[in-house]
Amino acid sequence: DTYPYADREAMAQWMARLNKEYPNFNTVGETWVTEPAYTAAWQKDSKLSNINSNLKSVMDFAFFDRINQAKNEETDGWWNGLNRVYNGLCYDYLYPNPASVMAFIENHDTDRFLGNGNDTLALKQALALLLTMNRIPQLYYGTEVLMNGTKEKTDGNVRKDFPGGFAGDKHNAFTVEG
């Protein structure tokens, strides 16, 4: 949500210099908008903007939004369930490089994918899609041990410490026993 807040021309110049100095370094810009056309305009070499951002990777909030709606829907029509995700991916042609778009199902600013529940089937399906689609997958810590929580009361509910590693922790996810 913050990348578009900065001076676009200054950021484009900064990214050009960074890319020249470190050509194998990747920078991801957070553009919290759920429409692919808007997000694609921020990716390097986009034809949708009159200023080349030189930003190699952008975050796929469209995928995040659609997969989180789809998890609560049946795929029984053209516009709901996994068809909702498919309909969003149809806009990949807008991105200069869809393989450099970073996709995710949750992060530190959102509810956990599991919310306050434990629907592991939906989580497994979402992760299977995330890890096999033409994107850079981003995994948020704790997903692998089924951490849940919502931002209903506080952001702290989705930013809890990973279980283990500190004296007094009831569970230690760093061990086989968990």
Language-model features, listed with the residues they occupy:
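A structural signal for short, well-ordered beta-strand segments and their strand-loop junctions
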Residues: 28, 104, 138-141
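Surface-exposed cleft-lining segments at the edges of enzyme active sites
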Residues: 111-115
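Short glycine-/polar-rich loops that comprise or flank the Walker A/P-loop
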Residues: 134-136
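Active-site-proximal helices and loops of the catalytic beta/alpha 8
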Residues: 2-97, 101, 118-120, 128-132, ...
